[in-house]
Amino acid sequence: MANEEELQTAESAFVTGARRYSNDYSESESSSKHSGCSTPVEGTPAEAATTIGARASGGSTTWQRLRQLLMERGSDVHLPVTEIHLKSQEWFGDFITKHEVPRKVFHSSIGFFTLALYVRDVDYRNVRLPLIVGFVHVLLLDVIRLHWPAFNTLYCQVTGLLMRKKEVHTYNGVLWYLLGLIFAFSFFSKDVALVSLFLLSWCDTAASTVGRLYGHLTPRISRNKSLAGSLAAFVVGVISCAVFYGYFVPAYSHVNHPGEIMWNPETSRLSLVQLSLLGGFVASLSEGIDLFNWDDNFTIPVLSAIFMHTIIAFSQR
């Protein structure tokens, strides 16, 4: 067996290499969201991290041997990404994980679920409390798992289908999602809050999907953002606003109480077509802005709500 000094050196070198690879791997996946391209990586994360760790340790031990020694000693190495395989990887493989298919399906379904609540006359003001409760629960779980590796492994096995690899050892993007919606549903009218949610649910998904597939064919407009992704957000934003204001608001007018719907064709200088086009522009702009490197799940509903409220308010006769 290797002596304690050699073991510590090998362990330190391996963990350093694995973390360095994990960061590069996460950054390359993040950059591919809209540009459709990423840094080529040889092998799986675990294989590449093993190679880096072995090289960093001077080849004095292999990953398998190091793990055996650490297990014998009872050491728990907290490795980012490389030691935890997400459910989407286990069930569908790396392609589905890379393109975040389960996450996008869930992301989009929230918009349809919210629309169903709207037509069933669920008071939008009652949505805030469940959102706040959900935020507190997810935050507590994240704090626990980020300080308890064993629980983190179990957590990722259960919810990993909806997680990004970079979230394995960082706070969950759901926190930002909930925080953005809490802001929108707390300070804006019913229609503005709902539209901001639709733009987050559908436009962000469209931008990510189209950007990954065709972003390399169009110019980049900012870091990790492509023209293809922004155009997709614009088109879906136009459709979302047109369908909501053009069909659902008048068809289900009985679920709207006085003052809840801010835009009215009789009191606004904006027609439905103009409002929808501006809604698409808001979606594209909110999705494309990189605000202090904050999470899109927070900036999109917040900026969308602010922009839509401002547009509708200034267009009143």
Curated annotation (Swiss-Prot):
- Membrane-side (Lumenal) residue stretches: 1-130, 189-190, 252-271, 315-317
GO terms under cellular component: endoplasmic reticulum membrane; nuclear membrane
Where is there biased composition of kind Low complexity?
23-38
Tell me where on the tree of life, at the top rank, the source sits.
Answer: Eukaryota
Q: Indicate the enzyme's highest-level EC class.
A: transferase
Reactions it catalyzes:
a 1,2-diacyl-sn-glycerol + CTP = a 1,2-diacyl-sn-glycero-3-phosphate + CDP + H(+)
- Tell me the Pfam families matching this sequence: CTP_transf_1 (PF01148)
Please list the cofactors this protein needs. Ca(2+); Mg(2+)
Q: What is this protein called?
A: CTP-dependent diacylglycerol kinase 1
**Native source organism of the sequence:** Eremothecium gossypii (strain ATCC 10895 / CBS 109.51 / FGSC 9923 / NRRL Y-1056) (Yeast)
Q: What taxonomic ancestry is recorded?
A: Eukaryota, Fungi, Dikarya, Ascomycota, Saccharomycotina
